[in-house]
Amino acid sequence: HVALALAYVILANHDHVKLHLLQENGGASPFYRRRRRMTDCFNFLAAATPNGALDLAASLSGHLQRLRRPGKAILISDFLMPAAAYQQGLNLLRAFNLDIAAIQVLSRQEVEPQFPNGSLALVDSESAKEIKYQWNDKARREYQTRLAHHNLELKSFCHQSGIHYSLYVNDRDLGDFVFATLPAIGLFK
């Protein structure tokens, strides 16, 4: 939804947009111009199916090789990867002299897990690896502390690197995020 909302704003402002899927064999759309191409944006994104772990830098590199001129890059991700992985990817974008925005999208469940106390079997959505975990109040606090540290580290890296950054938790009003938060961080005027 975030990608579609941003595409709409860009197209409504008489600019053009190109969508890239960052995954193994991830494709790219053609450049879309004008609001009437929103259906094409929707169809392109609707056809995408997540598949496996992401090597951010390698995936970006493939798309950047075809870049003809500098512009704006908006990277939408959960950024739930090691700091070195997202830093390498974002630095690659910086090397291409792009105006970069990093939009971290998390679900409310990722921010505030509501698991019942007890034994859990968690399945990684990217690797399909299952781990057994004992969940309780202490584990919840530790998880939230680690996530907050990870997010702060990402935000700090972006700030120090001149990258626009914002966190969007998906139970928040998307219109408010796109039309109030993103202009406030300098993404749109």
Model-found features: residue ranges?
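Exposed, interaction-prone extracellular/peripheral surfaces
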Residues: 1-189
